[in-house]
Amino acid sequence: MTPAQGSGDHRTAEGFRNPHDPTTRTLRDVWRWRRTTTPAPWPPWIDDPPQPAPPRLAAGRIAVTFIGHASFLVQVGGRCVLFDPVWSMRASPLSFAGPKRVRAPGQRLEDLPGCDLLLVSHNHYDHMDLPTLRAVRRRWAPPAVTGLGNARHLAKAGLRGARELDWWQHAEVAGLRVTYVPAQHFSARTPWDRNRSLWGGFVLESPDGGTVYFAGDSGWCPYFEQIGRRFPRIDLALIPIGAYAPRFFMRTQHMDPEEAVMAHRALGARRSIGMHFGTFAGLTDEPIEEPEARLTAARPTRACRRRPSPPCPSARRWRSRRLFEQLLLGEGAHRGPHGGGAHRVVADMRAAGDAGIG
């Protein structure tokens, strides 16, 4: 399907729009952001070295490794799926300017147990990194799925034949059912192609009953309730919590931690993990540690009554049946200094079962 073949109230003559957000950002808004606010200082580098490689798991379990920012390796249905992989030092078209990484990816790309499917939510540089995509293609040559209008970018990385989906469309790829779901955001890789390609998230469903939701980028909007109604058994949701400051500029495009908890509740997910924070300096104005602190304060009350999971000291505890990520939206958690250990995320749970979930 090409962009011209798409339909729905998110379509325009030139591309796409947000049906629930009529506002548009102009150069004047960018000027106001850059000239009237002062970004919080971030540390130049955090010593958070890559962790040992996770094993490849058989079907019947869901496992997730947080690479950093919005990059994840998810194992579901016996398949290894990469979401929005970015291993580059900058989330930028330029190697010498733009948002810069302050901590290493949580895993070396070459140490991953595989990649059977590649999912790219939208075309922003902190989600679609062509050097990383080229490396993924050279090593595994996986099939790729993305939103309408984005396959041309993936082709530049050698990933030809990527499957493009409109919102709510699905495809059977690599033995999994992949549904592209709505998000409230925008797209652009240059000043001239804003909203010419589609943005969104993904729901993965495996034959063994496991269901994983990846939000991509989104502001708070009615889509979370809609996704929860269409997919009432989401085992694991990956939800952004950072890049929300200043609010006058980011509010409709990026959720803050309190809104992320609202999204967790609206989705009805059994577990949710916070993402999109603490990795690239220059992407946002908030302090590096603030998303975690605000998330800790905002977690659902009912979850805090549960016996909290211990923090994950290292990815060596991979086989644990508990969810050790300290950024759980739905359970008590631990927060280290400057997000310490935030890239050492380990989750291993039974698909469509209660072990390690409750």
Set out the residue ranges of the language-model regions.
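Metallo-beta-lactamase
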Residues: 1-111, 146-216, 235-242, 294-316, 320-322, ...
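Cap/insert and terminal regions of metallo-dependent hydrolase folds
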Residues: 2-19, 109, 117, 143-152, ...
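Catalytic core of the metallo-beta-lactamase
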Residues: 72-77, 172-234, 251, 255-259
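Divalent metal-coordination and catalytic microenvironments
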Residues: 74, 84, 122, 129, ...
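Active-site metal-binding loops of divalent metal-dependent hydrolases
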Residues: 85-87, 123, 183-185, 216-218, ...
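Acidic/histidine-rich helix-loop elements
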Residues: 87-104, 186-194, 245-254
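Active-site metal-binding motif and surrounding structural segment of the metallo-beta-lactamase
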Residues: 93-146, 161, 232-238
